[in-house]
């Protein structure tokens, strides 16, 4: 017997977050709880992205149908059957599916009395550091934000680009954080030829890689950039679900996988292994999301080359505790000490 419920939570972002497509001041997440009637509750959350056709309203509209599948199967360990039945009822809406999958995974791990990463046998010492994202702003503000992030101990910064002053921004950020490992994300803002010019200039500032230089709608452009770029190329908007992995294997060096794009931990794990099989490096990213969602991604961190799991760090405050994340890394082994299995618990509970 499983009981389910969900609620919408409005999470103010500490500093309005801007990328080449627009600005966001609040993150609307949907938190799902699944209880087994004997005191264990699994928690998960959806962070819907309008870019992938979802909103808080679309998640709210489909969650009752997805959760009725969970209740009718009634077993948190029957994730394969529940996933198949969920997809039969609602084919798309990946963030809504992810929230349910995370909450079920959390409940299954809690019933077994281990954190998720230990259920999978993963090595907590193999987690890469997460990057901290510097959103678009005036060049001076981006310089200040980069200096503040470096002061706070973040050694890896991901800089949003896609403006008419990209080279000025990267010079200012490099100046403010001379020792940081820099990555950049254009969110598809460049044309292929512009991307080559930009990436040539970025290479002079010791940038590690470039994410989504051209729009996902231009796969030939992505290959054109990949074949000419002096820096590795990561595919994010071009790499959404499992079939995209082989499709980007000759167009990118790195697959950026997100639970909210692919529909949860099960699909994300399949994408990670598919990416490895196609010779891609693996990055796990996030939306702006509460720990009730992002903690799940953190449990996969030992499988990654690159982590971009700073969504909760960008919030003014997060009502959910999760995996401790800071400039030193993603601290999975801290969960054993706290006895916190699975994903987030409310801080005030
Ligand atoms: Mg991206």
Where are these regions (language model features)?
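Flexible C-terminal active-site loop/helix
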Residues: 4, 8-12, 27-29, 37, ...
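Predominant activation on well-ordered alpha-helical scaffold segments within soluble catalytic domains
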Residues: 60, 64-67, 101, 105-106, ...
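Hydrophobic faces of well-ordered beta-strands that scaffold small-molecule active sites
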Residues: 42-44, 128-134, 155-159, 182-186, ...
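Metal- or metallocofactor-binding catalytic centers and their adjacent structured scaffolds
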Residues: 6-8, 22, 35-37, 41-111, ...
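Haloarchaeal acidic low-complexity proteome signature biased toward cell-envelope/secretome components but also
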Residues: 1-19, 23-26, 65-66, 72-73, ...
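Catalytic alpha/beta core domains of metabolic enzymes, predominantly
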Residues: 217-308
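Metal-dependent enolase-superfamily TIM-barrel catalytic cores that perform enediolate-based chemistry
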Residues: 118-229
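Conserved, mostly hydrophobic/aromatic
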Residues: 32, 39, 100, 113, ...
């Amino acid at each position: 017997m499983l009981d389910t419920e969900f609620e919408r939570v409005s999470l103010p972002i500490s500093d309005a977050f801007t990328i080449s497509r627009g600005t966001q001041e609040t993150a609307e997440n949907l938190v799902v709880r699944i209880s087994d009637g004997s005191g264990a509750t699994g928690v998960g959350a959806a962070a819907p992205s309008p870019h992938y056709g979802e909103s808080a309203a679309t998640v709210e509209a489909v969650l009752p149908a997805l959760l009725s599948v969970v209740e009718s199967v009634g077993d948190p360990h029957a994730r394969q059957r529940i996933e198949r039945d969920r997809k039969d009822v609602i084919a798309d809406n990946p963030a809504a599916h992810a929230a349910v999958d995370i909450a079920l995974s959390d409940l299954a791990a809690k019933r077994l009395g281990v954190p998720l990463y230990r259920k999978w046998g993963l090595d907590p010492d193999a987690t890469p550091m997460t990057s901290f994202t510097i959103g678009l702003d005036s060049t001076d503000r981006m310089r200040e934000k980069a200096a503040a992030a470096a002061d706070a101990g973040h050694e890896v910064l991901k800089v949003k680009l896609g403006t008419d002053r990209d080279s000025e921004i990267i010079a200012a950020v490099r100046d403010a954080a001379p020792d940081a490992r820099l990555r950049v994300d254009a969110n598809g803002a460049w044309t292929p030829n512009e991307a080559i010019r930009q990436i040539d200039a970025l290479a002079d500032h010791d940038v590690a890689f470039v994410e989504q230089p051209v729009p996902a709608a231009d796969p030939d452009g992505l290959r054109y950039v990949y074949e000419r770029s002096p820096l590795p190329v990561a595919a994010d908007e071009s790499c959404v679900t499992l079939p995209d992995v082989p499709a980007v294997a000759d167009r990118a060096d790195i697959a950026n996988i997100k639970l909210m794009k692919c529909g949860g931990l099960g699909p994300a794990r399949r994408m990670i292994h598919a990416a490895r099989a196609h010779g891609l490096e693996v990055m796990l990213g996030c939306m702006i999301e509460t720990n009730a969602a992002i903690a799940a991604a953190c449990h996969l961190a030992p499988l990654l080359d690159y982590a971009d799991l700073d969504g909760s760090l960008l919030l003014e405050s997060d009502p959910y505790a999760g995996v401790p994340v800071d400039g030193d890394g993603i601290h999975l082994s801290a969960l054993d000490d706290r006895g916190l299995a699975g994903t987030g618990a409310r801080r005030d509970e």
